[in-house]
Amino acid sequence: MSRLGHFTGVFRVCGWGLGCSHGITYRFVNTLSGAESSPALPLKAENALLGALDMSSIEPTVYDLTAPEMEGRGRGTPGNARARAYIVSRLVNAGLAPLFEGAFGQPTFLERRGGSPYAVNVGAYLPAAKPTAGWIALVAHYDHLGVRSGSVHPGADDNAGAVAMLLALGDALGRARPPLRRHVVLLFSDAEEPPNVRTDRMGSAWFWRHPPFPLTTLHCALVFDLLAGPATPGARDAGLADVIFVLGAEASPGLARLARGVPPETSVEPLLLGLPLIEAYPFIPWRRFAQGDYHGLREQGRRPFLLVTGGRASTYHTAEDTPDTLDYAKLARVTRWVTRLLVHAAEDPRDLGWTDMVADPLADARAILRFHASTGNGSQFPWLLRRALAADRARVQALLHAWEAGAAPTAAEYRELTLIALRLQAALWHPAGWWFALW
């Protein structure tokens, strides 16, 4: 075992040319890189819920949510209101209970009596076997960019696919009605997209500040975004077409146990990553950039959560994010895996625990190398970027070799690792985008 397993010191993640006093403080752990737990056996409720799933509803739901009359579901628009009404009707038909004192909608920032809210969250839940039970929350934002520069941005992958998945799960919960240990919340948040992301104006941030249940009784939140984008040819060639990224499990052994303990689903490969790998930006080492609806929970509620995502496709935040581009077969497989995750989270008898500002460098390095295989021979990249990616891979291999041999990671090394991860994400998102993937 590396000395990391016994290391309890604190490092500041610094940027090039900047003093450590300006960096983010992470405590290095081996939560993910330590001994792995074996997948749990399927639970009775898990099999019942899987049997009640109707995968044929997912694709039509995505088409409904991206229809022209939805106008890209921009916050505060008629199209957003139509999408919200559609979601509410589905929850009513599923037989789920309204989450907000008899209502399915939660207005945010209602400035004056009779005024218009800034955004409206939608929520429903399946009651647990006992009224005094704790809660788990499954979260997917339903808003998108609306109309930008005269073009409707349909937002199929972002985030109609995840919404369709949760609605299919809601239908299954209503049909099977398994007597779970915890109440199961389905939250469809509003105002996730820019300019609201990472601000208190996010619908989910409002929800975490004004929860309909004591936040101390939240067992965990599972946040879903960008689940159905098509895999790149390199990812398919490397056997990574069904990879989904599960982020945040480094925060506690309980979360790691939960994420790793989900029984396997055909071809779905959950790749556990540390949140710092998606929250770093070049030249801004003193700030972390949250990437979704866990932001408010982390800042306000400080309860356990996982972010589950497929990552950005080339259509991300463009008018080409249309329903015909999604991989529905993959989304169906991911839905089955998420169903298993949901049941195991709802039935877990132990407190998960949660600690902020931790990182597992060994696990992150291994995950980067695993996904780096999707770059293939690099022929799709400009030569400068291809050279940088090759150098990055060699550097991660060298760091991992040193750490596995017993060297303790340093602040500068981990900052380097996060920027290597950022370059890999940027390169795979836009292979020709060398102007923002090189620094």
Q: Where are the regions a protein language model picked out?
A:
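Active-site-adjacent substrate-binding region
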Residues: 102, 220-221, 226-357
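Acidic/histidine-rich catalytic neighborhood of metal-dependent amide-processing enzymes
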Residues: 115-120, 146-252
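Second-shell loop/turn segments in exported
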Residues: 44-52, 68-78, 110-113, 148-159, ...
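Extracytoplasmic/secreted proteins, especially bacterial periplasmic and envelope-associated proteins
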Residues: 57-60, 64, 78-93, 103, ...
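Acidic, Ser/Thr-rich low-complexity intrinsically disordered segments
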Residues: 351-430
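Solvent-exposed loop/turn segments at secondary-structure junctions
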Residues: 70-72, 91, 114-115, 130-131, ...
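A non-catalytic alpha/beta surface segment that caps or lines the substrate-entry region
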Residues: 61-64, 72-127
